[in-house]
Amino acid sequence: MKILYSLRRFYHVETLFNGTFVLAGRDQETTGFAWWAGNARLINLSGKLLGAHVAHAGLIVFWAGAMNLFEVAHFVPEKPMYEQGLILLPHLATLGWGVGPGGEVLDTFPYFVSGVLHLISSAVLGFGGIYHALLGPETLEESFPFFGYVWKDRNKMTTILGIHLILLGLGAFLLVLKALYFGGVYDTWAPGGGDVRKITNLTLSPSVIFGYLLKSPFGGEGWIVSVDDLEDIIGGHVWLGFICVFGGIWHILTKPFAWARRAFVWSGEAYLSYSLAALSVFGFIACCFVWFNNTAYSSEFYGPTGPEASQAQAFTFLVRDQRLGANVGSAQGPTGLGKYLMRSPTGEVIFGGETMRFWDLRAPWLEPLRGPNGLDLSRLKKDIQPWQERRSAEYMTHAPLGSLNSVGGVATEINAVNYVSPRSWLSTSHFVLGFFPFVGHLWHAGRARAAAAGFEKGIDRDLEPVLYMNPLN
């Protein structure tokens, strides 16, 4: 066997169970990678790598279609989506398909269509992936120079980056078009408890849109996660669309400047590490967004946020005890603070009790009861609507707490329902999808930088502690 690495250093650090194993005409001897290193064997085979990526896209779209149809088949219209463990139908409902006032599902056919379209798309992608992985040219450079590339070719790499940015920008514009012209989107803030509406008055002011980026991520500020009206969300997508499209055109037309050529490592593994870092950032932002935001992720579909369920409980008992004759404005709790109402650090009137920590929650069922100084006592006495009572009682019993095999909801709430909130699912999964790509980013960045600097990857076996330990037997 030809040795591709110094035996002293064990360059690739893979110890093979079966060093002679050949897969798709490639083995460790010719590629330097074992069979399980997957696409690493295809680093310099652009045609085969294209096949791997297209097939991967096919798997992703197949999951989306199959899971979509699975959720449609199991969907019960009489129960809220969040009580049924659904994670895809809420996204479709948020886009305004199949739902009406209050988030009630009127028609599941659009959901069925979505699932079938994704399945058909996945078949096309799957065929393309298999074709390019097994039958197509190993490398694209000779036959299709436009699609060919060399990892070190900085100009080609930024051109590919530009094409990706343009596609992302067009994706942002698709949401804008849906919201403005094609039926609108679901707005949880629509009067009377939410409805589908077209967005007419876009927020395009740069001070508002980019103001979100300058906010603190903590407390009531909440960075971009604090966005609470659809005009800002859709206006933000207009900005994103233009930035991505013009940035893409810029990257296609220009070559990297000298400072960029010096600052970056220009290799396949380096690009992988950059991509993983970006995915990691997306994962962490998505985690916070789905956990805290009830505008982009309407509580009608995803269930209440944690703070929302807590405030709903305080509101429900305020309503009950007020009916029983309690004076909610002056009743004292066991700590000497107000039992139902108290003041926040900045002087607003807020709910008392343990939920005081969530005083800066904003929710569509609660905001109509606020005045210029927080909760308005006269509105609490005279203006509470039946839909607000119903919704808060529902949210109170569906807190996004609990684990796979537990009773969901607040542990002390006797009416809680056995369920796990989609917010719990989506935020925990996206935290994991933020954390592990970050570890992968560090790993691949380290390898890429080591390779670029010219020293060998892996551990020097001469200094490995195990060499100096007594045998176990």
From Swiss-Prot:
It is a multi-pass membrane protein. Pfam families: PSII. Its main location: plastid. GO terms for molecular function: chlorophyll binding; electron transporter, transferring electrons within the cyclic electron transport pathway of photosynthesis activity; metal ion binding. Binds multiple chlorophylls and provides some of the ligands for the Ca-4Mn-5O cluster of the oxygen-evolving complex. It may also provide a ligand for a Cl- that is required for oxygen evolution. PSII binds additional chlorophylls, carotenoids and specific lipids. The modification Phosphothreonine is found at T15. It comes from the Eukaryota. [CaMn4O5] cluster binds at E367. It is found in: Plastid, Chloroplast thylakoid membrane. Residues 1-14 form a propeptide. Keywords: Acetylation, Chlorophyll, Chloroplast, Chromophore, Manganese, Membrane, Metal-binding, Phosphoprotein, Photosynthesis, Photosystem II, Plastid, Thylakoid, Transmembrane, Transmembrane helix. The keyword Manganese applies. Signal peptide: none annotated. The modification N-acetylthreonine is found at T15. PSII is composed of 1 copy each of membrane proteins PsbA, PsbB, PsbC, PsbD, PsbE, PsbF, PsbH, PsbI, PsbJ, PsbK, PsbL, PsbM, PsbT, PsbX, PsbY, PsbZ, Psb30/Ycf12, at least 3 peripheral proteins of the oxygen-evolving complex and a large number of cofactors. It forms dimeric complexes. One of the components of the core complex of photosystem II (PSII). It binds chlorophyll and helps catalyze the primary light-induced photochemical processes of PSII. PSII is a light-driven water:plastoquinone oxidoreductase, using light energy to abstract electrons from H(2)O, generating O(2) and a proton gradient subsequently used for ATP formation. Belongs to the PsbB/PsbC family. PsbC subfamily. This is Photosystem II CP43 reaction center protein.
